[in-house]
From Swiss-Prot:
PANTHER family: 4-DIPHOSPHOCYTIDYL-2-C-METHYL-D-ERYTHRITOL KINASE, CHLOROPLASTIC. GO terms for molecular function: 4-(cytidine 5'-diphospho)-2-C-methyl-D-erythritol kinase activity; ATP binding. Coiled coil: none annotated. It catalyses: 4-CDP-2-C-methyl-D-erythritol + ATP = 4-CDP-2-C-methyl-D-erythritol 2-phosphate + ADP + H(+). It comes from Pseudomonas aeruginosa (strain ATCC 15692 / DSM 22644 / CIP 104116 / JCM 14847 / LMG 12228 / 1C / PRS 101 / PAO1). SUPFAM superfamilies: GHMP Kinase, C-terminal domain, Ribosomal protein S5 domain 2-like. The active site is at residues 12, 137. Belongs to the GHMP kinase family. IspE subfamily. GO terms for biological process: isopentenyl diphosphate biosynthetic process, methylerythritol 4-phosphate pathway; terpenoid biosynthetic process. ATP binds at residues 95-105. Pfam families: GHMP_kinases_C, GHMP_kinases_N. Pathway: Isoprenoid biosynthesis; isopentenyl diphosphate biosynthesis via DXP pathway; isopentenyl diphosphate from 1-deoxy-D-xylulose 5-phosphate: step 3/6. This is 4-diphosphocytidyl-2-C-methyl-D-erythritol kinase.
Length: 282
């Protein structure tokens, strides 16, 4: 088996986000619908025999040992008892604080890559359980299927939904998830709904009004995108998105947006590009 491996870490969108209540431990009960994008970071791994975990790519403002990639590698190392280590390089394309899962996706890709490189043989459930300790969004990336999520986001029901093209606008802000969920004006009493209701269009993102109020850049991006398509915030933001039936229409609207707005066009996918790549390795 090769000691080197390169894998993608795909972005995700929250197609809606309803907050049902707040638990005694401070976490929020929610419902959301995750779908992947064929766009993301790229990670490169090379196994080491001395047990060291080294991330060779610096992320501004994130200490090496606090990076989710390093925490994922060390967590798997400890839980599995593997004596092996790894060198990791990251091609970072996804924004931090964007609501499209950059850090969680990187962590999930790390877990799956090292399960393969270190020949651990862990099953999907065991990897997802370890991923949940790193963050509520990590399991959806380790499982790799579009899903209706409940609880704090960890109860996942796979779904088969349309796979449109998306135009994603990336405002230049770093949104604090903790800040949004602690805002006293955040809606916390949305009624539970079914997936069918979401697909019929009766849903929203409960975080969006709070984010728009706190971050004018996000509000302005929504105003601009709403001129061409129904736009919505993903997660706690700050990325916003609109869906299109084909790439040509998404590209057309992208070309009409101001040059200063960062954005990208990507296809939605119910099976993540990470898992499609992993299937070719088996």
């Amino acid at each position: 088996m090769s000691v080197r491996l390169s894998l993608p870490a795909p972005a995700k969108l929250n197609l809606f986000l309803h907050i049902l209540g707040r638990r005694d431990d401070g976490y929020h009960e929610l419902q959301t619908l995750f779908q992947f994008l064929d766009h993301g970071d790229e990670l490169h791994f090379e196994a080491r025999q001395d047990g060291q975990v080294r991330l060779h790519t610096e992320i501004a403002g994130v200490p090496h040992d606090s990076n989710l990639i390093v925490r994922a590698a060390r967590g798997l190392q400890e839980a599995s008892g593997s004596p092996q280590g790894v060198d990791i390089w990251l091609d970072k394309r996804l924004p931090m604080g964007g609501g499209i899962g950059g850090g969680s996706s990187d962590a999930a890709t790390t877990l799956l890559a090292l399960n393969h490189l270190w020949q651990l043989g862990w099953d999907e459930d065991r990897i997802a359980a370890l991923g949940l300790r790193l963050g509520a969004d990590v399991p959806v990336f380790t499982r790799g299927r579009a899903a209706f999520a409940e609880g704090v986001g960890e109860k996942l029901t796979p779904v088969d939904i349309p796979e449109p093209w998306y135009l994603v606008v990336v405002p230049q802000v770093l949104v604090s998830t903790a800040e949004i969920f602690s805002d006293p004006l955040l809606t916390r009493d949305s009624p539970a709904i079914k997936v069918r209701t979401v697909l019929e269009g009766d849903s929203r993102n409960d975080c969006q009004p709070v984010v728009e109020r706190r971050y004018p850049e996000v509000r302005n991006a929504l105003i601009l995108l709403n001129k061409f398509v129904s736009a919505r915030l993903t997660g706690t933001g700050g990325c916003v998105f609109g869906s299109f039936p084909n790439k040509a229409e998404a590209d057309k609207v992208s070309a009409l947006l101001p040059d200063h707005l960062q954005r990208f066009v990507a296809k939605g996918s119910n099976i993540s590009m990470l898992h499609r790549k992993l299937e070719t390795l088996v």
